[in-house]
Amino acid sequence: ADLTDLHILVVEDNELNLEIAVFSLEAAGLNVSTAINGLEAVQLFEKSKPYEYDIILMDIMMPVMNGLDAAKAIRGLSRPDATTVPIIVLSANAFAEDIQKSKNAGINEHLAKPLEMDKVLKVIASYCK
């Protein structure tokens, strides 16, 4: 899949994890923006032009605002892309109940950590055809 020029918002509070994700995604041709917590992600999304972000990749466990609350906040915004932008969350907890909580928050995909970049890129490609 050609991921060139897709714009992804990566939300991760761990600096090393964020750097690794950005490096890998940029190497795959994606255009990457970053936020360090859910609140910052919501604010960036609100300020962006509609459909500016093709996809959001977000950690669940973050200070200030976690990934689930951020996803709910984004889904609740009154703009055309708020309900359609694919949101993928990353979590060390991939139990059925966690995945259900993600679905309830309007999240499209729940990926387990540690991150396998090949898998992440496949998932991104599946949403951004």
Region roles according to the model:
Residues A1-K129:
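C-terminal compact regulatory domains
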